[in-house]
Amino acid sequence: DEVSSDDLVAYAAHGIGLRLDPYTQYLPEEEMSEFDILTTGKYGGVGSLIRKRGEWIIFARPYEGSPADRAGIRIGDKILAVDGKSAQGMEISEVSSLLKGDPNTIVKVKIQHLLDDQIETLHIRRERIAIPGIPYAGWVAPGIAYIQHSDFTEGCYEEMRRAIEQLQAEGELKGLILDYRSNGGGILQEAVKIVGLFTPEGTEVVRTKGREGEEIFCTKESPLLPNLPLAVLINNGSASAAEIVAGSLQDLDRAVLLGQKSFGKGLVQSTLPLGYNAYLKLTTGKYYIPSGRCIQAIDYSKHAEGKGYEVVDSMAFRTLGGREVWDGGGITPDCPLAPRYISNFALTLYALGFIEDYVDDYMKRHHSEPFDPTTFALSDEEYELFMRSIEEKEVPYESASRKMLARMKEAAQADHFEELEAQIAQLE
């Protein structure tokens, strides 16, 4: 049998990735458009998140001011067909591909509105959609502002600057909270420019070190807020560029960090062309923040199969003001805060979309009633309805204790500890 050149390149590149680290990735031509969306935050489409509910795909969040929003599409509206093709049974990726296209082209979308069940066919002109990197900016107390930053796509620095300037126009700014929780990172240069909003021109933010030498990234403009008190929120989902912003502000004693230890992704990623319009996203170095510490949590260089070992906090470094900080394993906050406990069962319900399903149903029943998010509380009757709706669904869930018992049983059988099996059986 003949093997195509495309397949040979794909097999070879995939094998390279398996031997190096989990971030080295082969990107064939058909995946490059998704990669571009992740890095630029822009695509041609109608401007909405979508999700699956049963056999159908529904609109999960039309972006404010997007073509979908202007066409009257609301959260929970069901997609019946796209350009005459029934959407029943389709996966999210299939419907997403149909909705996307070149800007200024028309897509015909047949929908069923959630609130009144009315069926409508909309002719929507696609536009160049920019996914907002700053989904929220507002006030949490007199003089204290809060900005949520979700990812480091192209142009997010300008978004951050505009958000700050808008807050300054609204009132006196006495302090600012930057929320980088669950921000997975993105473009390094955007992170450097954001740090430059709060630090003097010429400040070193990060340097990269690899086989081809090192490169130093410094701020290039006068700061917008050189002295404003800053607090930065992080958690174990804060990674890469988010860790660079948080870690550099900590090293420069420019902000206080609160939350949980960050993820620990301090690897430099570069894209190399392979031919046939395919690319290899390759790890080429590591990031080092101003104190000299590296934030990478896993060392993949010492394992033949690219599995890696955890980096133990081993070396002490000093912040600009002389405080002691440690390398390896991500960024440790100045003020550790325990995360709010959420059971694995609740997380499973959320991941499967069952909670959003109930919210849609709730809105359908109560959309005409006055609603104040600051005082809203779910009634006992509504909670019972929610519980019954979950009981009617199949939830593929296994408790942590059940999983631990299964692992104990496997270990006992593998090591021929027959005498333990009876004791394990009593626990089941």
Map each language-model feature to its residues:
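Cleft-lining beta-strand/loop regions that shape enzyme active-site pockets
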Residues: 1-5, 28, 37, 58-62, ...
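Polar, glycine-rich mid-to-C-terminal structural blocks
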Residues: 241, 253-254, 258-260, 264-323, ...
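A generic structural motif
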Residues: 51, 110-114, 288, 318
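Short linear motifs in exposed loops
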Residues: 61, 90, 123, 283, ...
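PDZ/PDZ-like peptide-tail recognition elements
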Residues: 11, 23-61
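A short, compositionally biased
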Residues: 44, 51, 101-108, 267, ...
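N-terminal activation segment of mature serine protease catalytic domains
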Residues: 1-25
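Conserved functional hotspot residues or short segments at active or partner-binding sites
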Residues: 294-428
